[in-house]
Each structure stands twice: as structure tokens, then as C-alpha cells.
Regions:
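PLP-dependent aminotransferase-like
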Residues: 1-26
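Active-site phosphate-binding strand-loop segment of PLP-dependent enzymes
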Residues: 17-48
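Short, conserved active-site loop motifs that form the nucleotide-linked donor/cofactor pocket
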Residues: 18, 162-163, 198-199
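Short acidic alpha-helix that forms the nucleotide-activated donor recognition element
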Residues: 29-35, 191-193, 212
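Conserved glycine-rich beta-strand-loop-beta hairpin in the small C-terminal domain of fold type I
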Residues: 137, 173-175, 192-198, 217-219
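ALDH superfamily catalytic-core signature
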Residues: 6, 33, 39, 47-185, ...
Length: 219
């Protein structure tokens, strides 16, 4: 904690206000149960939030939870396709899809679907994927082998459903190329967040349908 304080808060008057404690699940549960901690702010998975929130509320404590997300974007027939593609790539592949604000579902009007998909596939194919320590790299590895294996498993499930998968090849170790999945319907696989660079693309006819698709997820 001393190193963190000196690096990020060099002018902090009361040094003990900031403390760093290393730990895992057991330490998190202890903090959730400890009534001396008035506000618990936790960042992690939805499962983590579901586990911690009842423990904090049981002692009438306050909780602030930054959890997962299954974010969607609707591309209308009037969209600037080139601008849309830039925004999609930025939102879907940054930090290798490992952030709660990652774009995971793309809902595209049928009249611009083919044009957008052509440009999007081209953009994905040109992504610099690999070693994060190289300046030219845009997409680095997943956090561990378990995450990489989970991504590959989900892509295999998508293929088994008859969906078309672009990308998703293993580059090396935990590094996997971002994937685009063209889906015919929003099944449970798509409704469940995978913390990885997988972008599901769905087609829509009218705005009401697009909004219904967008909102039909639990997250």
C-alpha cells in the first residue's frame, strides 16, 4: 500500500486512509460481513455481486457493485456505416473484450447488414493481435487459460447451433483472435455474457423488433 500511495497519491495527508490488502474469495467475504466497513465497493462478475450483496445487506451495510454487462448496439438503416464500424471495433475488441462496458451484441437493420458485415469482417481481419508489450498490438491475451478455453467452448457451441463464426483462432497461449458470430436468433448462449472478445450479430426488420432484441437479456 505504501508503493501505491506514493505512486498515485503522493500528496495524501493521512497515509493510513489508503491500504492495499491482497487476498481472494475468503478476504472478500470477510469484508462483506464486517460491520466496520460502512460501504463496500466491489468490481467483478455478476456472480460475485450476487454472492456479496446479500451478505452486505444482511448487516444493513451499503454496497456499490460494478459487475458484468451484455451490452448491445442498434445500427439503423440511416447509419454512417464507416463510422459505425469504427465504433463497433473500438467497443467490442478493446481490452480483449474483458471489461463490463464491452460491446457484445450488434443488432443491424437488414438493408445495411451485408455492407456492414463486409467492412466489419475486413476490420477484424486486420487487427494487430498478440503481445501487449509490443506498441503495435491492439488486442492482447485473455487473463488466463480458463478464460481462453471458455471463449473457444462458446464459439464451438455457436457453430453447433449453425451460426457462422469469423475469427476466434488461437494465436498463442491465452491469446485468441476476436470473433464475430452471425446468429439467426438471440438464444440463451447470446443472452449470457462471455467475458471475451465475442461479438454476436443479429439482423432486424423494424425498430420495435430491434429494441425488443436489445432488451431481452437479464444483464
Amino acid at each position: 500500500d505504501k508503493a501505491v500511495s506514493e505512486c498515485f497519491y503522493p500528496d495524501l495527508k493521512f497515509k493510513d486512509l489508503l491500504q492495499v490488502v491482497e487476498g481472494d474469495k475468503e478476504q472478500a467475504e470477510w469484508m462483506a460481513d464486517d460491520s466496520r466497513i460502512n460501504l463496500l465497493s466491489a468490481t467483478g462478475s455478476t456472480a460475485m455481486g450476487k454472492a456479496l450483496a446479500p451478505r452486505v445487506s444482511a448487516r444493513m451495510g451499503k454496497g456499490l457493485y460494478e459487475l458484468g454487462g451484455n451490452n448491445g448496439m442498434i445500427v439503423s438503416r440511416y447509419a454512417n456505416i464507416d463510422l459505425a464500424v469504427r465504433g463497433i471495433v473500438f467497443g467490442a475488441v478493446g481490452t480483449a473484450g474483458q471489461r463490463c462496458t464491452t460491446l457484445r451484441r450488434l443488432i443491424v437493420h437488414e438493408s445495411v447488414y451485408d455492407e456492414l458485415m463486409s467492412k466489419l469482417k475486413s476490420a477484424y481481419a486486420s487487427l494487430p493481435v498478440g503481445d501487449n508489450f509490443k506498441e503495435e498490438t491492439l488486442v492482447g491475451p485473455l487473463i488466463n487459460q480458463e478464460s481462453a478455453d471458455r471463449m473457444l467452448s462458446v464459439l464451438e457451441q455457436a457453430k453447433a447451433k449453425g451460426y457462422t463464426v469469423h475469427g476466434g483462432e488461437v494465436v498463442e497461449g491465452c491469446t485468441v483472435r476476436p470473433a464475430i458470430v452471425e446468429a439467426t436468433e438471440q438464444c440463451d448462449l447470446i443472452k449470457t455474457e462471455t467475458f471475451a472478445p465475442i461479438l454476436y450479430v443479429l439482423k432486424y426488420t423494424d425498430l420495435e423488433e430491434a429494441i425488443n432484441i436489445h432488451n431481452a437479456v437479464p444483464q
